[in-house]
Amino acid sequence: MATLQEKLITPIAAESTTPNNKITVVGVGQVGMACAISILGKGLCDELALVDVWEDKLKGEMMDLQHGSLVLQTHKIVADKDYAVTANSKIVVVTAGVRQQEGESRLNLVQRNVNVFKFIIPQIMKYSPNCTILVVSNPVDILTYVTWKLSGLPKHRVIGSGCNLDSARFRHLMAEKLGIHPTSCHGWILGEHGDSSVAVWSGVNVAGVSLQELNPAMGTDRDSENWKEVHKLVVDSAYEVIKLKGYTNWAIGFSVADLIESMLKNLCRVHPVSTMVKGMYGIENEVFLSLPCVLSASGLTSVINQKLKDEEVAQLKKSADTLWGIQKDLKDL
């Protein structure tokens, strides 16, 4: 006897079983779920997979998202502890990792995350060998290097979220000070995501007008308007948000969806993201730092050769040396 479905639907051709734009998010903590929501909100994928070791939380988040699928463009939302659920992903977003314990050294924190990534990355590669991996876990620059080493992927397919968010914060704060919209205020934060990031004051402009030409002291201690404070606020803003609400998640979620959109839609937009910078600006070691990069359907396809002042190059090199000081002592890579 025919089922209701068979009575209702007459098949004409076999359905495709392979998704066109599948995205996987590894880790369903605050950041992972903010990434998932932002990806779904932009309608970037035809299938979203969630993976974590936390089974109940994983199932709960999946069900909660599925129940909202009526108003989303993505109706297929899956989740499992088994990485088989991630098969055929185009982009894999890694947000998983361990948190720093009180008094723990940065090297020890990174080494513990290396041990986590030694499980995650081979599983990703097993089921989605043709994917691009976007690393969000902190410290993002070092863990992007770790991912590159563990995955065996070419460097254009391993990208760190890097300073995309730092630059967004920078533009927001400058625009607020100038009373204009952030999209009309252009500026870049490069280097390490975090305390040693580099504000490229020489490139800050509005409508092509260099702000440093109007105020040559901009970004220095001699500046009576104290624009340098804007960069300090960028660096401190994550700590401030964490102090107020316990974690940061929404801004990084929006930032990640922004990067994914550039890749899946082949937009060739320029973003400050973490890439392998050996051989650039006199950097001699295999470190990942943020530079202005072109993101397209192939991944990270080009780096923009931004003209930097000598002091900005020196700051970049200092960032690279700091990261290499930790990376060179990592074990089991």
Swiss-Prot record:
For the ligand (substrate), the binding residues are: R106, N138, R169, T248
Q: Which keywords does the record carry?
A: Cytoplasm, NAD, Oxidoreductase
The main location class comes to cytoplasm
Query: Which gene underlies this protein?
Result: LDHB
Entry keyword NAD: yes
Matching PROSITE patterns, A to Z? L_LDH
User: What Enzyme Commission number(s) apply to this enzyme?
Assistant: 1.1.1.27
Q: Which GO terms describe its molecular function?
A: L-lactate dehydrogenase activity
Signal peptide range equals: none
Q: What does this protein do?
A: Interconverts simultaneously and stereospecifically pyruvate and lactate with concomitant interconversion of NADH and NAD(+).
Q: What is the protein's name according to its record?
A: L-lactate dehydrogenase B chain
Where, in this chain's numbering, is NAD(+) bound? 29-57, 99, 138
* Upper taxonomic lineage: Eukaryota, Metazoa, Chordata, Craniata, Vertebrata
GO process terms (BP): lactate metabolic process
State the pathway, as annotated in the record. Answer: Fermentation; pyruvate fermentation to lactate; (S)-lactate from pyruvate: step 1/1
**Catalysed conversion reaction:** (S)-lactate + NAD(+) = pyruvate + NADH + H(+)
Q: Which family does it belong to?
A: Belongs to the LDH/MDH superfamily. LDH family.
Q: Where is the active site?
A: H193 (proton acceptor)
Leading EC class: oxidoreductase
- Which species is listed as the source? Trachemys scripta elegans (Red-eared slider turtle)
